[in-house]
């Protein structure tokens, strides 16, 4: 059975995350230009309601923030409005075209990897537990808490090898230019996530 077939089967086995909800704190400025706390609160799981009837979420998938241009425009809270528009549109894929996406993802114990590719440069940080990074060639790479992965538009997947403990990772995805290797264009390939997530729309 392939990694993607195992992932599809695992959808039936897991409910929500066992890790505590995280709080997002956003800063800003008051009328005098002094730093203040703009807002705080929990971030909802963006997987809710996206699976077919009878299926359950295989992981928690929270979009903490997005930007939609380089460099980001913070004047008059333009970035906050842009983020809200992205979330409310319901069209966000894994990558936000011309911008960034910051996610917190919780992987249940013993969940196979969903192998996929995005047209993006990604930073992955292990916050809790451990995770195996699955690539097309070579042995899985085991990342421990505090380790980081720089994912450069490759086919890859993440597998929590623990039988009992959840894994939490932070991901920052940045749109990148179209990638070619030896004349072959490598485009987004969502694999088993294609039935759950929308296309990013940045590799046309």
PLM segments and residue spans:
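Glycine- and acidic-residue-biased ligand/ion/polar-headgroup-sensing regions
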Residues: 119-137
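Signature of the catalytic double-stranded beta-helix
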Residues: 63-108
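A short hydrophobic beta-strand segment most commonly corresponding to one strand
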Residues: 100, 122-123, 148-157, 163-180
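N-terminal leader/capping segments at the start of a protein or of a new domain
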Residues: 1-76
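Double-stranded beta-helix
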Residues: 8, 14-15, 161-204
């Amino acid at each position: 059975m392939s990694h993607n077939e195992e992932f599809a089967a695992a959808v039936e086995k897991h409910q929500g995350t066992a890790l505590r909800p995280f709080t997002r704190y956003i800063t800003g400025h008051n009328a005098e230009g002094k730093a203040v706390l703009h807002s705080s609160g929990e971030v909802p799981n963006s997987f809710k309601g996206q699976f077919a009837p009878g299926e359950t979420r295989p992981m928690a998938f929270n979009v903490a923030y997005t930007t939609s241009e380089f460099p980001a425009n913070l004047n008059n809270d333009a970035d906050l409005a842009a983020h809200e528009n992205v979330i409310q549109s319901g069209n966000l894929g894994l990558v936000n075209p011309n911008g960034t996406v910051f996610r917190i993802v919780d992987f249940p114990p013993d969940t196979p990897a969903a192998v996929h590719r995005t047209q993006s440069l990604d930073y992955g940080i292990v916050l809790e537990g451990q995770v195996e990074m699955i690539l097309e060639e070579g042995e899985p790479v085991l990342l421990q808490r505090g380790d980081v992965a720089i994912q450069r538009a490759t086919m890859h997947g993440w597998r929590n090898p623990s039988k009992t403990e959840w894994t939490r990772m932070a991901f920052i995805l940045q749109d990148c230019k179209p990638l070619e290797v030896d004349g072959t264009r490598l485009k987004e390939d969502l694999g088993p996530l294609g039935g759950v997530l929308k296309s990013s729309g940045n590799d046309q």
